[in-house]
């Protein structure tokens, strides 16, 4: 980085800065101005967008497969009459796994279109997608996976939404970011969705008698046990959010800036002119 004359510029060549100077020899150094041009973050690259696009396709396909299987009643006990299609749809979208994968689909599509996407609301949604899909993978692996005995399409669908998609999302964030998106405010606001989901699940379950997960079922467990599970889930969500927050601060990568096709930085922060030496 350095100071360059008005008609000089920083060119970004192979990810490194190169100063192209073409100022008039007689121009005083005190008149010089420059812009600090950050090298483009890796999250701005075509590889990053391709990764996010692949995550979007796999997550959307996985969610669609789950929906079709649920619509057809493949998961149902053949000895018990199944619910109506309207109830199936409502239950499908009541699962935390479904909502987390939906957030992944939306955010992955947004990042596939523009890898450096940003905004106050977007940051919260992106963190919800990261924490939600991570919790989906952890809870499934340690609590639900030991109880599963699926085969064929059931196994494939279950593995995709609970294991493959979480791994892709976390790896994509580790490699491509984008970074400098998570703040204390974002972490706090990110808790609104899981708290709302828990309250909704317990209230609707109390009314209808149906719960998406056995550990939240007040008909099978005492209220104190369910309360402990809820507290544990929220603590786990908060811890995972803090881990993403710390990674966002410490892992390599910087907030990407826009760079025109000719290498001229568009929105790089400006620095004050350098003072003349005395």
Which positions does each model-derived feature cover?
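Interfacial segments of alpha-helical transmembrane regions
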Residues: 117-133, 183-191
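Membrane-interface loop-to-helix entry segments
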Residues: 96-98, 154-167, 230-231
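Perimembrane loop-to-helix junctions flanking transmembrane segments
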Residues: 75-90
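Non-cytosolic membrane-interface motifs at loop->transmembrane helix junctions
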Residues: 122-124, 148-161, 184-186, 216-220
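N-terminal membrane topogenic signal
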Residues: 40-54
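Interfacial helix-start motif at the membrane-water boundary
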Residues: 87-103
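Membrane-interface transmembrane-helix boundary segments in multi-pass integral membrane proteins
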Residues: 43, 47, 94, 208-244
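Alpha-helical transmembrane segments of multi-pass membrane proteins
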Residues: 57-76
